[in-house]
Amino acid sequence: MLKSEKEEMIKELHEKFSRTTSAVVAEFTKVDVETVTKLRKKFREGNVEYKVIKNTLARRAAQGTSVSVIADDFTGPVALCISYGDVVAPAKILVEFAKDIEDKIKIRTAVVEGRKVDVAGVKALAKLPGLPELRAQLLGVISEPASKLVRTIAAPGSQLARVVQANADKAQG
C-alpha cells in the first residue's frame, strides 16, 4: 500500500471514528468465510459497520477521537464493529453471534460514547434494549396517559347513550 493510500485511509477512518457512538474490538480466529458473511449480514441489518483494519493505521486514525481510549487493544487479528447511532447494536449482535461460535470470537473491549468498557460491560450492554425498543417503550409510556384521558372523557357520553338505548328498548318492548 502506498503512503498516499495509507494517509487517505487514516483520514477516512479518523472521520468515521469521530462520528462513532460505540465500537467493539473483537478477535476472530479460525472463522470461516461463510460465518463472516453471516456476521456481516447481521451487522448490516443492525446498521453497524464491520471493519478489519491494519492495527497501526487504526491506532493512528484513532488519535484525537473517542476511539483513542481503546487504541492499545488494536493488536493481533482484530475487527472493529462500529455504530454511529444505536450504542448497544454492536455489542448485542456480537454477543448474540458469539453464543454459536464462542471459541472463534473473543470480545476484547469496547468504547461507548468515549468511555472504555471491558468484556463484562459489553455483555451487560448487550442485554439492554436497543434504540428501536427504547423508542417503542417511551412511546407507550407517553401515549398511555393520553389514552386513559380519552377513555375517561368519553365514558359519561357512552354511559348516557347506553341508558337512552335501554329506555328506548324498554319502551318498544
Swiss-Prot record:
InterPro entries: Ribosomal_uL10, Ribosomal_uL10-like_sf, Ribosomal_uL10_bac, Ribosomal_uL10_bac_type
GO biological process, one term: translation
CDD domains attached to this UniProt entry: Ribosomal_L10 (cd05797)
Keyword vocabulary terms for this entry: Ribonucleoprotein, Ribosomal protein, RNA-binding, rRNA-binding
Molecular functions (GO terms): large ribosomal subunit rRNA binding
GO CC, one annotated term: ribonucleoprotein complex
Family: Belongs to the universal ribosomal protein uL10 family.
Complex and partners: Part of the ribosomal stalk of the 50S ribosomal subunit. The N-terminus interacts with L11 and the large rRNA to form the base of the stalk. The C-terminus forms an elongated spine to which L12 dimers bind in a sequential fashion forming a multimeric L10(L12)X complex.
Matches recorded under HAMAP family: Ribosomal_uL10 (MF_00362)
Primary role: Forms part of the ribosomal stalk, playing a central role in the interaction of the ribosome with GTP-bound translation factors.
Stored NCBIfam families: PRK00099.1-1
Protein's UniProt name: Large ribosomal subunit protein uL10
Species for this entry: Myxococcus xanthus (strain DK1622)
